[in-house]
C-alpha cells in the first residue's frame, strides 16, 4: 500500500471537519423545529410569520417556587399571548394580575405581565408570571378587551390568541376557584413577612400586658376617597361608628383580640378610634409610596376589618379568617353601582355592616 502523503492527510482532516459541521447544524435545526423555535434563533433578523411569544423575564421572576426557568409552566398545553394593562395602585394591580392569570388558564392561553406590573408587585410577592418583552409587545397584533368587575360567561370562551385586557377587575368571581394558587402567587418575600411578624410579636394588650393571641387587621381607606366617594359616586367611607361596631363584633366572638390599625390617614384614626380599652394598636405607617409595609402587617393578622377599596379586599382575602366590611356605602342611584356589584366584590361568608349614609342626604339638601 502506498503511504499517505501529507497532502492527503490534510484533505481527509478537512473532509471530517466539514461533515462534522454539517451534522452539528442539522442537529440544531431539527432540535429548534421540534421545540417550536424555527429559524429565528439562528437568524435573528428573519421576520416571523406569526408574532413571537416572549420568553424574556426580568431578574427575580422564577416560574415556580422550585425553578428559575424562563418558560411558563405547562407551556406545551397553552398557546397565544395574553397580557393586561397595569393601571391604578397596588390593590388594583393585584386584581389585574389575578384576573389575567385566571382567565388565561380558563382559555388555555399563556399569560404575561408588562414591566410596570412587575415593578409594582415583584418587590413584594413571589409572583411567577413572566414579563413580556417591550419589543414583543410592540410587534404583537393585539385585540383589546376592557373587563367589567365580575365574571361573565363570555369571558370563559375568548378565542383571541393575542389579547390585551384592561380595566380594574378585582372580583373573587374571576379567580376564587384558584384561591390556593392566587395565595401562592401573592406570597410575601421572607423579609417582609418576618418584619411584619416581628411587629406583631412586640404588641401587648394595654391593661394586662399580655401577649395577644388573636390579631385583627384594620384597614381604613382615606386619602382621595374622601372627595371621590361623595362627589363622584354618592358614597361614603367608613366612619368611627362603623369601626366601633366592627370591633365590637370581634370582641363578642374572640377572646381578647388586638386591633392592628393601618391607614393612609393615621392621624384621623388616632382621633376617631376609641383606644381606651387597651386593645387598639396604631401600627401602620400610612406611607402610600411604600404600601407593602402596612399590607404585610394586615396579611399576617388572623382576621380583617376593611372599609372600602381593593387594598383592604386583598388584605382580607390573603389573611383568611373572619372579615367584616362596609356594606351599602352608596346611595341607590349611584353610578358606581353600574360598575360595582357587591355580591361579586365580597365573599358570601364575609360580614357586612351597613354604612351611615346620612352625610349624603345632608349634601343633597338644597
From Swiss-Prot:
InterPro entries: Glyco_trans_11
Role this protein plays: Catalyzes the transfer of L-fucose, from a guanosine diphosphate-beta-L-fucose, to the terminal galactose residue of glycoconjugates through an alpha(1,2) linkage leading to H antigen synthesis that is an intermediate substrate in the synthesis of ABO blood group antigens. H antigen is essential for maturation of the glomerular layer of the main olfactory bulb, in cell migration and early cell-cell contacts during tumor associated angiogenesis. Preferentially fucosylates soluble lactose and to a lesser extent fucosylates glycolipids gangliosides GA1 and GM1a.
Subcellular locations according to the entry: Golgi apparatus, Golgi stack membrane
Name assigned to this protein: Galactoside alpha-(1,2)-fucosyltransferase 1
Pathway(s) per entry: Protein modification; protein glycosylation
Lumenal topological domain residue ranges: 26-366
CDD domains: Fut1_Fut2_like
This protein's UniProt keywords: Glycoprotein, Glycosyltransferase, Golgi apparatus, Lipid metabolism, Membrane, Signal-anchor, Transferase, Transmembrane, Transmembrane helix
Domain of life per record: Eukaryota
Enzyme Commission number, as recorded: 2.4.1.69, 2.4.1.344
Topological domains, Cytoplasmic: 1-8
Biological processes, Gene Ontology terms: carbohydrate metabolic process; fucosylation; lipid metabolic process; olfactory bulb development; positive regulation of cell-matrix adhesion; positive regulation of endothelial cell migration; positive regulation of endothelial cell-matrix adhesion via fibronectin; positive regulation of sprouting angiogenesis
Catalytic reaction equation(s): a beta-D-galactosyl-(1->4)-N-acetyl-beta-D-glucosaminyl derivative + GDP-beta-L-fucose = an alpha-L-Fuc-(1->2)-beta-D-Gal-(1->4)-beta-D-GlcNAc derivative + GDP + H(+); a ganglioside GA1 + GDP-beta-L-fucose = a ganglioside Fuc-GA1 + GDP + H(+); a beta-D-Gal-(1->3)-beta-D-GlcNAc-(1->3)-beta-D-Gal-(1->4)-beta-D-Glc-(1<->1')-Cer(d18:1(4E)) + GDP-beta-L-fucose = alpha-L-fucosyl-(1->2)- beta-D-galactosyl-(1->3)-N-acetyl-beta-D-glucosaminyl-(1->3)-beta-D-galactosyl-(1->4)-beta-D-glucosyl-(1<->1')-N-acylsphing-4-enine + GDP + H(+); a neolactoside nLc4Cer(d18:1(4E)) + GDP-beta-L-fucose = a neolactoside IV(2)-alpha-Fuc-nLc4Cer(d18:1(4E)) + GDP + H(+)
Species name: Aotus nancymaae
Gene Ontology cellular component terms for the protein in this record: Golgi cisterna membrane
Keyword Amino-acid biosynthesis annotated: no
GO molecular function, a single term: alpha-(1,2)-fucosyltransferase activity
PANTHER family documented for this protein: GALACTOSIDE 2-L-FUCOSYLTRANSFERASE, GALACTOSIDE ALPHA-(1,2)-FUCOSYLTRANSFERASE 1
